């Protein structure tokens, strides 16, 4: 029997959930407090996994004006070692950069073209009724909506979670990131994706992701600790853009655009609240980000699809919750644990240097490491036999038929 579902939040997780439920025959309404297009603090990078999921949702990359594929990656160790990591240049897309202002808007329009109702400028206000028979929600400009399930795709601070009394007091995320668009780029960053493992960022890193028209998305991600204050991170941000090995790849006359933005990164899928009654949490609301790289778009899409499938497959709210949690465990838990271990190891400079030296052993290690890093295979695939297959690190990328 079709369910009526309200999705709160029209980012990648919310739209993926909406598209999944609609395809399976359910009645879906999506609301978002913002009006699109709107910017979203993000590195804008899409891994192979995220690209394959978008393809599976029948999303057309040509909807994104500044969609930029990339096959050349350079990593630099704090020791000065540079490692060229070539992704396949044929056989589909393995990495892409898509500005979130454009990507999220395009996903909203993609859902609308499917016939899904999306209300912009309509913020969640409160839950007015919630029991075993249904849930009612008050939404700005729409009044009270009564549905079978609510899917909260409303971000790390999740007003829905807060309204249910499920927020963690003082939680600021596991990581913090800064980002700024930079124009007039004429160095190698114009075409190549750069990653810098700076000693004062470990286990984090700085990045430069190429965009059309001599622009890049430049930023860094850093583990949040008690000795890394906001002031420390602001000072670090200003210093990064003066380091010679970074300015060299941007070119002499690069121009930062507008102001930099910063955002917390939630990465605790192992103990985050996943559901409550008839409410499921997805994306950043369920803290699904990869704790090794900070990648979150692929994980957001996966949680959205998992929530939609759980609602479709089950007849009771209890079964929906259990099925959704099982799907999350199957999709993300082993990878999260692997990423957590690797992240802790990379905190130590001597270990980070050894790992990067190992990556640079030969062409085979470089080729396969970069495909693993960009989630061509799951993080913990070696330890999860159920995910083994004959085309290990040899599958085509996304959109290979185009």
Model-derived regions: residue spans:
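FAD/FMN-dependent oxidoreductases across multiple families
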Residues: 66, 144, 224-310, 315-318
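Beta1/beta-strand and adjacent pyrophosphate-binding region of the FAD-binding site
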Residues: 1-13
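Glycine-rich FAD pyrophosphate-binding loop
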Residues: 8, 22-42
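C-terminal helical "tail/cap" subdomain of flavin- and related membrane-associated enzymes
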Residues: 309-402
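Predominantly flavin-linked oxidoreductase catalytic cores and closely associated redox partners
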Residues: 110-248
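Conserved Rossmann-like nucleotide-cofactor binding loop
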Residues: 13, 36, 157
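A conserved beta-strand/loop capping segment in the N-terminal third of enzymes
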Residues: 51-105
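Conserved N-terminal glycine-rich FAD pyrophosphate-binding loop of Rossmann-like flavoproteins
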Residues: 35-55
């Amino acid at each position: 029997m079709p369910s009526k579902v309200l999705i709160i939040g029209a980012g990648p997780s919310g739209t993926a959930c909406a598209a999944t439920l609609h395809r399976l025959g359910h009645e879906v309404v999506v609301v978002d407090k913002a009006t699109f297009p709107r910017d979203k603090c993000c590195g804008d990078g899409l891994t192979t996994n995220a690209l394959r999921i978008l393809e599976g949702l029948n999303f057309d990359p040509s909807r994104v004006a500044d969609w930029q594929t990339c096959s050349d990656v350079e990593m630099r160790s704090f020791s000065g070692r540079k490692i060229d990591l070539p992704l396949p240049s044929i056989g589909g897309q393995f990495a892409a950069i898509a500005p979130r202002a454009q990507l999220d808007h395009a996903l909203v329009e993609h859902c609308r073209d499917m016939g899904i109702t999306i209300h912009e400028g309509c913020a969640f206000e409160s839950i007015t009724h919630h029991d075993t028979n249904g849930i009612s929600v008050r939404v700005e400009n729409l009044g009270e909506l009564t549905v079978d399930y609510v899917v909260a795709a409303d971000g790390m601070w999740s007003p829905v979670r807060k309204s249910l009394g499920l927020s963690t007091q003082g939680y600021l995320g596991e990581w913090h990131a800064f980002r700024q668009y930079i124009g007039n780029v004429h160095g190698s960053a114009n075409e190549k994706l750069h990653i810098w493992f700076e000693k004062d960022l470990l286990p984090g890193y700085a990045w430069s992701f190429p965009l059309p028209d001599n622009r890049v998305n430049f930023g860094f991600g850093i583990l949040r600790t008690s000795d890394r204050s906001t002031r420390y991170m602001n000072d670090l941000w200003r210093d990064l853009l003066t380091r010679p090995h970074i300015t060299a790849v941007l070119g002499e006359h690069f121009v930062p655009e507008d102001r930099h933005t910063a955002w917390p990164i939630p990465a605790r899928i192992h103990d985050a609240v996943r559901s409550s009654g008839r409410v499921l949490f997805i994306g950043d609301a369920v803290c699904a980000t990869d704790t090794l790289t900070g990648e979150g778009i692929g994980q957001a899409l996966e949680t959205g699809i998992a929530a939609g499938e759980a609602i479709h497959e089950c007849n009771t709210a209890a079964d929906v919750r259990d099925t959704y949690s099982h799907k999350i465990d199957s999709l993300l838990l082993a990878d999260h644990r692997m990423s957590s271990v690797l992240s802790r190891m990379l905190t130590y400079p001597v270990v980070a240097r050894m790992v990067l030296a190992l990556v640079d052993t030969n062409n085979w290690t470089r080729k396969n490491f970069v495909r693993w890093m960009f989630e061509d295979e799951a993080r913990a695939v070696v330890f999860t036999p159920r995910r083994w297959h004959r085309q290990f690190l040899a599958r085509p990328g996304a959109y290979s038929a185009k």
